[in-house]
């Protein structure tokens, strides 16, 4: 009886033949993945930036009326450092070179998260307008701080540190002059406090805020 030789083992593909080859394949895969991610990021970053610029411009126009300025608000930003609030990005409205308004954002803790508030202020410290940029408050209750849901936020236009007096910058339940919402006092209280902080920021930094913008080079 003739012995039959054992069948030859199938040869492994070259990329499985050794740990080195396997490592090379993994490195190539990682490189291709990184390149694809970079290309995808480049293709989406420009539209995202453009949308962000559009949203910023639209928000600024809501708190500083268009007829008060002849400059590009979004492009006229200067940082202002403050001992209480840190460094704040301030957008400066000008007309014929004179400062006519300022806009900046502050945030404060609401019922269920931070509430971002954009303030527009005249050079004399009077509020031109206020808008809530974002929040996570309770739908149907706290979301009345949105101008799309209620006109409550419009009531701050024309107010200042002198009107009402500082002791009355509170909701009515706390002895102030501003309405709270039925079933939601914490949210309007937080917005009132944030707006008051914004007015105090202006008061502390009025000289720097209302100084003329440097000429464009």
Curated annotation (Swiss-Prot):
Its EC number is 7.-.-.-. Pfam families: FMN_bind. Its cofactor is FMN. InterPro entries: FMN-bd, Ion_transpt_RnfG/RsxG. It is found in: Cellular chromatophore membrane. One of its GO terms (cellular component) is plasma membrane-derived chromatophore membrane. GO terms for molecular function: electron transfer activity; FMN binding. The modification FMN phosphoryl threonine is found at residue 185. It is an enzyme of class 7 (translocase). GO terms for biological process: electron transport chain; nitrogen fixation. Its main location: membrane. The chain crosses the membrane at residues 23-43. The keyword Transferase does not apply. It is a single-pass membrane protein. Induction: Expression is reduced under iron-limiting conditions. It comes from the Bacteria. Keywords: Electron transport, Flavoprotein, FMN, Membrane, Nitrogen fixation, Phosphoprotein, Translocase, Transmembrane, Transmembrane helix, Transport. HAMAP family: RsxG_RnfG. Belongs to the RnfG family. Part of a membrane-bound complex that couples electron transfer with translocation of ions across the membrane. Required for nitrogen fixation. Involved in electron transfer to nitrogenase. The complex is composed of six subunits: RnfA, RnfB, RnfC, RnfD, RnfE and RnfG. This is Ion-translocating oxidoreductase complex subunit G. The gene is rnfG.
